[in-house]
Amino acid sequence: MSTYHPKSGDITRKWYVIDATDVVLGRLATHAADLLRGKGKPLYAPNVDCGDHVIVINADKVAVTSNKREREMRYRHSGYPGGLKSMTLGRSLDLHPERTIEDSIVGMMPHNKLTAASAKKLHVFSGSEHPYAAQKPEAYEIKKVAQ
């Protein structure tokens, strides 16, 4: 019996919506990255894009533990000499929470060409409204852990 390899036509993609209200940023990122890669599916293969679409709402209400809002730094570079820009995680979450959560989720995925295709299925919104109601997304609950 030969090993089964899924093809792109064999995969049925679901839509999930995650409410980020009071969810720790790292826990949210790992759950969303696993959904985007399709790690929970029986047809999972690391070389095939078999993940689902993920919608993250209330990105501006995500939780960050300890004093990481002031301690953690976010960096980006313009490509020009002296073009390194930095800001704290708290300032980044205040200015553009969607981009900060997208960067965190994509950072939890392997850095290859397949991740670029999987990241296109990630949709992050700072409010509770999203334009994907016609796809009938399922609510995905992230369990709270007592700390």
UniProtKB/Swiss-Prot annotation:
Gene3D superfamilies per record: Ribosomal protein L13 (3.90.1180.10)
One GO location term (cellular component): cytosolic large ribosomal subunit
Range of residues in the leader sequence: none
Keyword Acyltransferase: no
GO molecular function: mRNA binding; structural constituent of ribosome
Keyword vocabulary terms for this entry: Ribonucleoprotein, Ribosomal protein
Pfam families, per database record: Ribosomal_L13
Cited InterPro entries: Ribosomal_uL13, Ribosomal_uL13_bac-type, Ribosomal_uL13_sf
One GO BP annotation of this record: translation
Source organism, top-level taxon: Bacteria
Family: Belongs to the universal ribosomal protein uL13 family.
Quaternary structure (record): Part of the 50S ribosomal subunit.
HAMAP family for this protein: Ribosomal_uL13 (MF_01366)
NCBIfam families associated with the record: rplM_bact
PANTHER family assigned: LARGE RIBOSOMAL SUBUNIT PROTEIN UL13M (PTHR11545:SF2), RIBOSOMAL PROTEIN L13 (PTHR11545)
Function according to Swiss-Prot or TrEMBL: This protein is one of the early assembly proteins of the 50S ribosomal subunit, although it is not seen to bind rRNA by itself. It is important during the early stages of 50S assembly.
Protein name, per record: Large ribosomal subunit protein uL13
The species this protein was found in: Corynebacterium glutamicum (strain ATCC 13032 / DSM 20300 / JCM 1318 / BCRC 11384 / CCUG 27702 / LMG 3730 / NBRC 12168 / NCIMB 10025 / NRRL B-2784 / 534)
Organism phylogeny: Bacteria, Bacillati, Actinomycetota, Actinomycetes, Mycobacteriales
